[in-house]
């Protein structure tokens, strides 16, 4: 397990507990009470740290290398029924954007999401979860296919942003994202969006328009990353903590501002500490959202979605 800087007290206590247990196993010394005290201190420390996370610390947790990515979520949600689909039928298949059909229980869904890599080689293969225009066009192709066959859509969002390279701009990155936003706003099937990691800027918005937008507890959603914001305002990444607070990018901030509809709770310490529980909770929230939407007529579904987004950004003096 890799520990973040603010988790070091937990790491130290775990090491102490391991040493205590080894001493008890390898000698005749009774260390039961000592181990019990360390365990209690460990639990108290975890509650204190994870119960008082700053915005920047939640950003760090959203990027934890052990945190489950999109494919892992889909695999656990669909229990072996996932059939991946490829290509945008215009340019090529973008490995940073994945999608396909799968079932949760007896209900079919079209899944779409950004995929990061689990190691250096895979991160390069997946372009670090930064889709090109063909990725967003593939996502739209699959969503339009879902509309044709009346299949609800689930998007899993985890990206540091759309790929900013010149070749992406030449192929119409801005147009691809804008087109997705337009088409998702009027898609005639339920759309459930789940932010499972990073939700950065237009890269997230390109698959982020839905009837229900859910955020996992330790994720973020913003027009810009804290580091980039800091580099623009202060010409340095040193102020990323202040930028994270100012951006109001946490799940609690987004719920308060009515940008997202619900927060999916995570196990203590983050989704990577207990993946099975995290997967189960995500499944429950997806099905809950779908059950709220499935009986709506197409007209009411689209009208409610448009009304929801029309109300965002209201300002009262």
Curated annotation (Swiss-Prot):
GO biological process: fatty acid biosynthetic process; malonyl-CoA biosynthetic process
Catalytic activity: N(6)-carboxybiotinyl-L-lysyl-[protein] + acetyl-CoA = N(6)-biotinyl-L-lysyl-[protein] + malonyl-CoA
Enzyme class name: transferase
Pathway as given in its UniProt record: Lipid metabolism; malonyl-CoA biosynthesis; malonyl-CoA from acetyl-CoA: step 1/1
One Gene Ontology MF term: acetyl-CoA carboxylase activity
Subcellular location: Cytoplasm
Alphabetical keyword list: ATP-binding, Cytoplasm, Fatty acid biosynthesis, Fatty acid metabolism, Lipid biosynthesis, Lipid metabolism, Nucleotide-binding, Transferase
Domain of life: Bacteria
GO cellular component, one term: acetyl-CoA carboxylase complex
InterPro entries: Acetyl_CoA_COase_a_su (IPR001095), ClpP/crotonase-like_dom_sf (IPR029045), COA_CT_C (IPR011763)
Gene3D superfamilies: 2-enoyl-CoA Hydratase, Chain A, domain 1
Protein EC: 2.1.3.15
Record has Transmembrane as a keyword: no
Domain CoA carboxyltransferase C-terminal: 37-292
PANTHER family with a match to the protein in the record: ACETYL-COENZYME A CARBOXYLASE CARBOXYL TRANSFERASE SUBUNIT ALPHA, ACETYL-COENZYME A CARBOXYLASE CARBOXYL TRANSFERASE SUBUNIT ALPHA, CHLOROPLASTIC
Subunit-structure text: Acetyl-CoA carboxylase is a heterohexamer composed of biotin carboxyl carrier protein (AccB), biotin carboxylase (AccC) and two subunits each of ACCase subunit alpha (AccA) and ACCase subunit beta (AccD).
NCBIfam families linked to this entry: accA, AccA_sub, PRK05724.1
Annotated family: Belongs to the AccA family.
Role description: Component of the acetyl coenzyme A carboxylase (ACC) complex. First, biotin carboxylase catalyzes the carboxylation of biotin on its carrier protein (BCCP) and then the CO(2) group is transferred by the carboxyltransferase to acetyl-CoA to form malonyl-CoA.
Protein name: Acetyl-coenzyme A carboxylase carboxyl transferase subunit alpha
Organism: Flavobacterium psychrophilum (strain ATCC 49511 / DSM 21280 / CIP 103535 / JIP02/86)
Upper classification of the organism: Bacteria, Pseudomonadati, Bacteroidota, Flavobacteriia, Flavobacteriales
Gene designation per UniProt: accA
């Amino acid at each position: 397990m890799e520990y973040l800087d603010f988790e070091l007290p937990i790491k130290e206590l775990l090491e102490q507990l391991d040493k205590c247990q080894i001493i008890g196993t390898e000698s005749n010394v009774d260390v039961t009470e000592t181990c019990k005290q360390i365990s209690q201190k460990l639990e108290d420390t975890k509650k204190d740290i994870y119960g008082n996370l700053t915005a920047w610390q939640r950003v760090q947790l959203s990027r934890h290398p052990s945190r489950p990515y999109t494919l892992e979520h889909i695999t656990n949600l669909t229990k072996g029924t996932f059939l991946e689909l490829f290509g945008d039928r215009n340019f090529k298949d973008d490995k940073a954007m994945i999608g396909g059909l799968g079932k949760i229980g007896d209900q079919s869904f079209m899944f779409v999401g950004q995929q990061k890599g689990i190691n250096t080689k895979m991160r390069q293969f997946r372009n670090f979860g930064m889709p090109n225009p063909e990725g967003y066009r593939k996502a739209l192709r699959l969503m339009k296919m879902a509309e044709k066959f009346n299949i609800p859509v689930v998007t899993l969002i985890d990206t540091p942003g759309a790929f900013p390279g010149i070749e992406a701009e030449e192929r119409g990155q801005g147009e691809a994202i804008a087109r997705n936003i337009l088409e998702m706003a009027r898609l005639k099937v339920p759309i459930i969006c789940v932010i499972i990691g990073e939700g950065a800027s237009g890269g997230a918005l390109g698959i982020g328009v839905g009837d229900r937008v859910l955020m996992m507890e330790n994720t973020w959603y913003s027009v810009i990353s804290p580091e980039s914001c800091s580099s623009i305002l202060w010409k340095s990444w040193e102020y990323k903590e202040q930028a994270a607070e100012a951006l109001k990018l946490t799940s609690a901030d987004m719920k308060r501002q009515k940008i997202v509809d619900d927060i999916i709770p995570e196990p203590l310490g983050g989704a990577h500490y207990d993946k099975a529980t995290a997967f189960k909770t995500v499944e429950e929230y997806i099905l809950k959202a779908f059950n709220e939407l499935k009986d709506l007529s197409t007209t009411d579904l689209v009208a409610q979605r448009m009304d929801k987004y029309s109300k965002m950004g209201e300002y009262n003096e």
